[in-house]
Amino acid sequence: MSKKQLVKTDGHNQLDQPNTKALQLKKKQFNSGVRVTSEISFLREVIAHHPGIETERVIDNQTFGSAMYLERAQKEHQLFIKILRQHGTKVHYLQDLLLEALSAADPNVRQDFIKNFLLESGIKSVSTFEACLNFFRSLDSLVDVIKVMFGGIKVSDVPPITPQRFADIHVSNSPFLIKPLSFSLYPHKFFNTLGTGVALFVTNDSELKRHSLVYEYIMRFHPRFDGVKLYTNRDFKNCLINSSDIIQISNEILLIGISHDTDVLGIESLARNLLSDHTNPIKQIIAINIHKFGAKTNLNKLIAMVDVDKFIIARKVLQATEIFELTATAQRDVDGLAQIKFKPLKFNFGEIIEAIIDKQPRFVIIGGGDEVAERKELLDCGMGVLNLSPGEIVVFDRNHYTNNLLNELGLIIHKIPASELSRGPSGPLEMVCSLWRE
């Protein structure tokens, strides 16, 4: 790859479109399609999740600092949504989309969804499975079913289960038969728009995979996504790909981190389906090996684009030297799949960014370069900023070192209080999934 020109390729999509079916809701009720041209384009539509009881039912997950105080978390989140709406961004709530999708589908689909949800909840006892299934069937409405799915089912919610076999004995000290969907606050972790298509992300974590079932059914049965192309799905085998490792830095280019959550097979699988779709504007993937930076490090913890030439970075990302370019070809591999051309790039990280944006980048080191401040603001999701438009961002107010530096660069900064929201693993960026940017 030269520093001034990036290769463009065309081809054919290798992954079938989602198995959508005839829907009862009229399509004119919904906008159709998705489109994201870059991380910083004007934000038109998003998916968000209003914090519910699941946010204070975090009792055994090491990813959260602690359970959130629900009332305060809801107020903080409402301020966040208010900023989006004042900007002109349409907000679709996750539970509303799921309700619309299941309402549009056949009754059999709803029953299958409940059963699949229970199967992915890790229930090993037939009696417990039946008790939970009957509990769902006893609820008055689909709205109640969805609320219970997100909030979890406690042992005390169902009638006492009489053990019929040894596997029916409840030996766990957890108060839950089905754990809450505690990560629902972060739609970006599970579902993301890439150009004019979408990706469902692949993980080995059983809890996160259970969350992604919600997005699979929305994708398959909601009129909004009828005909939208799916580039990765939950059925991908023997590979990993995480939304936190993907940054759409321009209309044609994705940056992807090779990490403990995103492996080379996952990147190749995404590349094969995405880059060979000639209707999608994305034509290249730049893969950066970030393994050496730690097991819990994803690319969006190392770099955040905040304007056409401005980036927040963690100092260590400048040490990244193993970088690859992936593009589509017209050839086929021995397995008959579209062949992906790849080559190592002999540029350092800063030179790669300069080549992509075609100008000298301006890097702001998180925390202002102070080692203690950098660690503190990385932990407080200072890198997880959400772009509303070029040079206009939403941030947590507590990251004042970085916020002040961005303010000095002339950025428009919307600060939200985050005494509770910052207890979670992510910032404003992952609290929404962008559906449309322009």
Swiss-Prot record:
Question: What SUPFAM superfamilies does this protein's entry cite?
Answer: Pentein
In terms of superkingdom, the source organism counts as Bacteria
MF terms (GO), sorted A to Z = arginine deiminase activity
- Which InterPro entries would you find in this protein's record? Arg_deiminase
The record's Pfam families line, in alphabetical order, gives: ADI
Protein transport as a keyword of this entry, yes or no, is: no
Cysteines engaged in disulfide bonds, as pairs: none
Q: Which UniProt keywords apply?
A: Hydrolase
Family statement drawn from the similarity comment of this UniProt entry: Belongs to the arginine deiminase family.
From the Swiss-Prot or TrEMBL record, give the protein name: Arginine deiminase-like protein
According to its UniProt entry, this protein's organism is Mycoplasma pneumoniae (strain ATCC 29342 / M129 / Subtype 1) (Mycoplasmoides pneumoniae)
